[in-house]
Protein backbone atom coordinates (compact mmCIF):
# COMPACT_ATOMS: atom_id res chain seq x y z
CA UNK A 1 0.00 0.00 0.00
CA UNK A 2 0.88 3.68 -0.04
CA UNK A 3 2.78 3.01 -3.25
CA UNK A 4 2.79 6.55 -4.55
CA UNK A 5 2.83 8.85 -1.53
CA UNK A 6 5.41 10.58 0.66
CA UNK A 7 8.23 10.46 -1.87
CA UNK A 8 8.31 6.75 -2.61
CA UNK A 9 9.24 5.97 -6.19
CA UNK A 10 8.34 3.02 -8.35
CA UNK A 11 9.54 -0.50 -7.58
CA UNK A 12 9.51 -3.38 -10.03
CA UNK A 13 6.11 -4.42 -8.65
CA UNK A 14 4.56 -1.02 -9.42
CA UNK A 15 5.96 -1.11 -12.93
CA UNK A 16 4.96 -4.70 -13.61
CA UNK A 17 1.43 -4.13 -12.31
CA UNK A 18 1.09 -1.09 -14.54
CA UNK A 19 2.21 -3.17 -17.53
CA UNK A 20 0.37 -6.46 -16.80
CA UNK A 21 -2.27 -6.15 -14.06
CA UNK A 22 -3.81 -9.44 -15.16
CA UNK A 23 -0.71 -11.26 -13.82
CA UNK A 24 -1.67 -10.21 -10.27
CA UNK A 25 -4.25 -12.12 -8.22
CA UNK A 26 -7.67 -10.56 -8.76
CA UNK A 27 -5.86 -7.64 -10.44
CA UNK A 28 -4.91 -6.29 -6.99
CA UNK A 29 -1.83 -4.10 -7.30
CA UNK A 30 0.69 -2.42 -5.02
CA UNK A 31 -1.60 0.49 -4.21
CA UNK A 32 -4.15 -1.81 -2.56
CA UNK A 33 -2.17 -4.64 -1.00
CA UNK A 34 -1.71 -3.30 2.51
CA UNK A 35 -2.94 -0.55 4.79
CA UNK A 36 0.01 -0.80 7.20
CA UNK A 37 1.48 2.55 6.13
CA UNK A 38 -1.65 4.37 7.29
CA UNK A 39 -2.66 2.02 10.12
CA UNK A 40 0.59 0.83 11.68
CA UNK A 41 -0.34 2.01 15.19
CA UNK A 42 -3.57 0.02 15.16
CA UNK A 43 -1.83 -2.97 13.59
CA UNK A 44 0.91 -2.96 16.23
CA UNK A 45 -1.71 -2.68 18.96
CA UNK A 46 -3.38 -5.78 17.53
CA UNK A 47 -0.03 -7.57 17.49
CA UNK A 48 0.38 -6.80 21.17
CA UNK A 49 -3.21 -7.81 22.01
CA UNK A 50 -2.79 -11.15 20.26
CA UNK A 51 0.40 -11.98 22.17
CA UNK A 52 3.05 -11.35 19.53
CA UNK A 53 6.45 -10.48 20.95
CA UNK A 54 8.22 -9.73 17.66
CA UNK A 55 7.37 -8.35 14.24
CA UNK A 56 9.33 -8.64 11.03
CA UNK A 57 8.78 -6.01 8.39
CA UNK A 58 10.78 -4.55 5.54
CA UNK A 59 12.35 -1.22 4.78
CA UNK A 60 11.50 -0.37 1.19
CA UNK A 61 14.56 0.75 -0.72
CA UNK A 62 12.34 2.73 -3.13
CA UNK A 63 10.82 4.59 -0.19
CA UNK A 64 13.98 5.29 1.84
CA UNK A 65 16.27 6.17 -1.07
CA UNK A 66 13.84 6.83 -3.93
CA UNK A 67 16.54 7.13 -6.61
CA UNK A 68 18.33 3.99 -5.42
CA UNK A 69 21.40 6.01 -4.43
CA UNK A 70 21.92 9.44 -2.98
CA UNK A 71 19.36 11.47 -1.11
CA UNK A 72 17.41 9.89 1.74
CA UNK A 73 13.68 10.54 1.92
CA UNK A 74 13.04 12.16 5.33
CA UNK A 75 9.37 11.18 5.27
CA UNK A 76 10.47 7.56 5.00
CA UNK A 77 12.93 7.98 7.86
CA UNK A 78 10.15 9.44 9.98
CA UNK A 79 7.78 6.60 9.07
CA UNK A 80 10.27 3.84 9.89
CA UNK A 81 11.34 5.58 13.10
CA UNK A 82 7.69 5.83 14.14
CA UNK A 83 7.07 2.16 13.38
CA UNK A 84 10.17 1.04 15.28
CA UNK A 85 9.35 3.26 18.26
CA UNK A 86 5.73 2.07 18.31
CA UNK A 87 6.88 -1.55 18.32
CA UNK A 88 9.28 -0.92 21.18
CA UNK A 89 6.68 0.97 23.25
CA UNK A 90 4.42 -2.06 22.87
CA UNK A 91 7.18 -4.53 23.85
CA UNK A 92 7.26 -5.98 20.36
CA UNK A 93 10.76 -6.70 19.07
CA UNK A 94 11.42 -5.06 15.68
CA UNK A 95 13.04 -7.35 13.11
CA UNK A 96 13.91 -5.54 9.91
CA UNK A 97 14.31 -7.06 6.48
CA UNK A 98 16.16 -5.06 3.84
CA UNK A 99 14.94 -6.67 0.62
CA UNK A 100 11.65 -8.43 0.03
CA UNK A 101 11.65 -8.75 -3.76
CA UNK A 102 11.04 -5.01 -4.24
CA UNK A 103 13.87 -3.71 -6.40
CA UNK A 104 13.55 0.02 -7.10
CA UNK A 105 12.65 0.36 -10.77
CA UNK A 106 15.50 2.82 -11.30
CA UNK A 107 17.90 0.10 -10.12
CA UNK A 108 16.24 -2.50 -12.36
CA UNK A 109 16.80 -0.15 -15.28
CA UNK A 110 20.53 -0.36 -14.46
CA UNK A 111 20.37 -4.15 -14.67
CA UNK A 112 18.92 -5.11 -11.29
CA UNK A 113 20.82 -7.92 -9.60
CA UNK A 114 22.70 -8.55 -12.85
CA UNK A 115 24.58 -5.29 -12.23
CA UNK A 116 27.55 -4.82 -9.93
CA UNK A 117 26.53 -1.16 -9.64
CA UNK A 118 23.25 -2.28 -8.05
CA UNK A 119 25.14 -4.55 -5.64
CA UNK A 120 27.15 -1.55 -4.43
CA UNK A 121 24.03 0.62 -4.24
CA UNK A 122 22.33 -2.05 -2.12
CA UNK A 123 25.29 -2.17 0.27
CA UNK A 124 25.06 1.63 0.64
CA UNK A 125 21.29 1.34 1.25
CA UNK A 126 21.90 -1.32 3.91
CA UNK A 127 24.55 0.83 5.60
CA UNK A 128 22.16 3.79 5.67
CA UNK A 129 19.48 1.60 7.29
CA UNK A 130 21.94 0.41 9.95
CA UNK A 131 23.01 4.00 10.64
CA UNK A 132 19.46 5.35 10.84
CA UNK A 133 17.76 2.56 12.76
CA UNK A 134 20.49 0.36 14.26
CA UNK A 135 20.32 2.12 17.61
CA UNK A 136 16.98 0.33 18.17
CA UNK A 137 16.89 -2.49 15.65
CA UNK A 138 19.17 -5.35 16.68
CA UNK A 139 17.82 -8.05 14.37
CA UNK A 140 18.31 -7.63 10.63
CA UNK A 141 17.70 -9.80 7.59
CA UNK A 142 19.45 -8.83 4.40
CA UNK A 143 17.16 -10.73 2.01
CA UNK A 144 13.82 -12.47 2.24
CA UNK A 145 14.11 -15.81 0.44
CA UNK A 146 17.03 -14.80 -1.79
CA UNK A 147 16.47 -17.66 -4.23
CA UNK A 148 12.98 -16.43 -5.20
CA UNK A 149 14.07 -13.47 -7.38
CA UNK A 150 16.60 -15.79 -9.05
CA UNK A 151 14.07 -18.51 -9.83
CA UNK A 152 11.01 -16.35 -10.30
CA UNK A 153 12.65 -13.51 -12.18
CA UNK A 154 15.22 -15.37 -14.26
CA UNK A 155 14.09 -19.00 -14.63
CA UNK A 156 10.33 -19.50 -14.22
CA UNK A 157 8.63 -16.21 -15.16
CA UNK A 158 6.70 -15.52 -11.95
CA UNK A 159 8.63 -12.41 -10.85
CA UNK A 160 9.78 -9.38 -12.77
CA UNK A 161 11.81 -9.11 -15.03
CA UNK A 162 10.27 -12.36 -16.33
CA UNK A 163 13.45 -13.69 -17.95
CA UNK A 164 14.21 -17.33 -18.67
CA UNK A 165 17.99 -17.50 -18.87
CA UNK A 166 20.15 -19.79 -16.72
CA UNK A 167 23.33 -17.78 -17.21
CA UNK A 168 21.65 -14.55 -16.15
CA UNK A 169 20.03 -16.38 -13.22
CA UNK A 170 23.47 -17.52 -12.06
CA UNK A 171 24.74 -13.93 -12.25
CA UNK A 172 21.76 -12.73 -10.20
CA UNK A 173 22.37 -15.46 -7.61
CA UNK A 174 26.04 -14.52 -7.34
CA UNK A 175 25.31 -10.81 -7.04
CA UNK A 176 22.64 -11.46 -4.41
CA UNK A 177 25.20 -13.37 -2.34
CA UNK A 178 27.75 -10.62 -2.92
CA UNK A 179 25.24 -7.94 -1.86
CA UNK A 180 24.50 -9.97 1.25
CA UNK A 181 28.20 -10.20 2.11
CA UNK A 182 28.81 -6.51 1.45
CA UNK A 183 25.87 -5.47 3.63
CA UNK A 184 27.07 -7.69 6.48
CA UNK A 185 30.53 -6.11 6.12
CA UNK A 186 28.93 -2.65 6.38
CA UNK A 187 27.07 -3.73 9.51
CA UNK A 188 30.20 -5.09 11.17
CA UNK A 189 32.24 -2.00 10.27
CA UNK A 190 29.67 0.11 12.11
CA UNK A 191 30.33 -1.97 15.24
CA UNK A 192 26.70 -2.96 15.70
CA UNK A 193 27.32 -6.67 16.43
Where are the regions a protein language model picked out?
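Homeobox/homeodomain signature
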Residues: 27-30, 51, 89-91
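Glycine-rich, proline-tolerant flexible connector loops at the mouths of alpha/beta enzymes
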Residues: 59-72
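Catalytic domains of carbohydrate-active enzymes, especially glycoside hydrolases
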Residues: 39-60, 93
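Short, acidic/polar
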Residues: 33-47, 118-129
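Aromatic- and Gly/Pro-rich amphipathic surface segment
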Residues: 10-45
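Active-site region of glycoside hydrolase catalytic domains
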Residues: 1-24, 67-68, 78-193
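Short, solvent-exposed segments of well-ordered alpha helices
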Residues: 31, 38, 71-74, 167, ...
Amino acid sequence: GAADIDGRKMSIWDYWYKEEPERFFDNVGPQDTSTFYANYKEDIKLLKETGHNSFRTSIQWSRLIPDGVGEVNQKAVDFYNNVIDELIVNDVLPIMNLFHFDMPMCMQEKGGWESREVVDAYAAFAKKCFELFGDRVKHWMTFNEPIVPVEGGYLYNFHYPKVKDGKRAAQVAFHTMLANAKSIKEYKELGQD
